[in-house]
Amino acid sequence: MKIISIEGNIGSGKSTFFRFLENYYKDDPKIIFLDEPVSLWESIKDTDGENILSKFYKDQTKYSFQFQIMAYITRLSLLRKISKEKDIIVITERCLYSDYYIFAKMLYDQNKMTEIEYQIYMKWFYEFEEEFKVYRMFYISVNPDLCFERIKQRSRGGEDSISLDYLEQCERYHEEMINIMSKKISCLTIHANMHITNDQYKYWAVLLFDQCT
């Protein structure tokens, strides 16, 4: 099993590219798609009906550990369900490394996750890291200002609290992750501040699967 992760900031267009790939390769039984389990996150609600994703964006200090553990477990669960499949390529929308190097690390650095919480999180990460190593990362790099405008335009539930400053921080941690991971695996960076056509998506798909089979 080879895992290829589509990476990018919130609003970078990674989900759009992921959907394009999913449709483009829909008839290939050897390619499996695992999107970011947002629907699972949105299903976890308090007694007032507010989901954990919305609560996290509103109060990251209070909900950082709960959210990151939940995100890790849901990603891990999806991977485990297909782990017995042989000779397949798995395309994921973000991955366990994204959670670790970007979101958990950023929350810890900002003192929104305590030392004990971060150590517990790292125990979870290292326990399963070897089991689900990523073969390649495909990073869609987009200016945070453009990401911010896209987020406002799409008005997705739970995202109304996302600030430009948060997106700028996310970009920095994405870049740091790619720098670290590029020393271990194949990492491709695509700059996508322009409108992307279907022909460009097809070219990206060629790059994505180069030497994977």
Give the predicted meaning of each segment.
Residues 17-18:
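Post-Walker A alpha-helix
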Residues 9:
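P-loop (Walker A) phosphate-binding loop of NTP-binding proteins
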Residues 100-172:
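A glycine- and Lys/Arg-enriched "phosphate-lid" helix/loop adjacent to the NTP-binding pocket
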Residues 47-89, 108-112:
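Conserved nucleotide-sensing/catalytic segment adjacent to the nucleotide-binding pocket
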Residues 23-68, 102:
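Conserved substrate/cofactor phosphate-moiety recognition/catalytic segment
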Residues 14:
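Conserved lysine of the Walker
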Residues 148-213:
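NTP-dependent small-molecule kinase module
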